[in-house]
């Protein structure tokens, strides 16, 4: 009898164990389904570009080549050889007499003090931020995230603190001031906002992108460090971003991709753009002879990462086939994909004519594809990280940006970095809207200046 009860007890225990294990399997399956469902079907963080503003210097800050050289001569800082080199670079730079420098640089000798740099920063950023706020009736206290990038001017209090103080922003605003990131830092700032918005929903962000010219003039004799004196000009951009659903109807663009490439592990790339001290103890930014080659290498790596995300399968297949054929010795060159099948517009950092022409050649683009970049270099000079936004405004002012179009921004910067941002136009762009090109867009492109080839001999 006891043996019978013992058998029943064991049977009940086994049944109980079976049910518990079965429930465990069901629960585990539910958890896995929930996890996969969350990652595959969760709402994506969509980044909207509501609008942006670019600084347009007043005409009295123009720096014609003749005046530029005259001021350098009168200053008594440079010997004749250095003056001749800078004049040669200026005349071949592709920069027009309309490009501007701050009032403090017009002084003789130029004022390179911290107060001069602050004055320049205030002049540029206060104007473009106020323009954005006024145009869209934005309360400064509604800004949740504030990011600035200025490579060589890193004051304390920071640049974002200047803006917070000027416009009376909230005490809990998330602010970041990036420095030392070079001319590609504008895209880096957008990427930082993108990452922050993954965590902070329903946020409004303001990105400020510029370089201060006033404190960074070089006063020595080193050829590689004199180039920066001639190509950098006054400029800046303010970009208003949002991940709020209610802003989708008024946004101009939607962010599609950001690809960042850093080749700083290679010494030649790392040293291609570097702030340093010359033999006489004078500080400047040296640009190496290998700069175009370094930029090309970084761009190739960046393109390899971007290509599969944007190119049609037909172009990807052509690339793969040519790659295999080259491995087997059947072809010498690998097929360059036609990126015009992925993008309607291209904005290449206006760092110099050699850089623009290098990208044009590498990607096999047409003259019209790089028109915005050349025109920006011609009209505004190298405005560092903000140049990409002047180019985008150029396309808008020309009436070329249509709903559904995609634009590829390509930035290069010290480190060495190559960064890409892809935007999709999601609204009708009014070409008559006021921007940094409105008063003279009918004059562009400038024949003979923006399309002629530049021999890369400035450093030879």
Swiss-Prot record:
UniProt protein name: 3-ketoacyl-CoA synthase 7
A biological-process GO annotation: fatty acid biosynthetic process
Encoding gene (name): KCS7
Pathway: Lipid metabolism; fatty acid biosynthesis
Enzyme Commission code: 2.3.1.199
Membrane topology type: Single-pass membrane protein
Principal location class: membrane
Alphabetized PANTHER family for the sequence: 3-KETOACYL-COA SYNTHASE
Protein localization: Membrane
Keywords per UniProt: Acyltransferase, Membrane, Transferase, Transmembrane, Transmembrane helix
Species: Arabidopsis thaliana
Catalytic activity line of the entry: a very-long-chain acyl-CoA + malonyl-CoA + H(+) = a very-long-chain 3-oxoacyl-CoA + CO2 + CoA
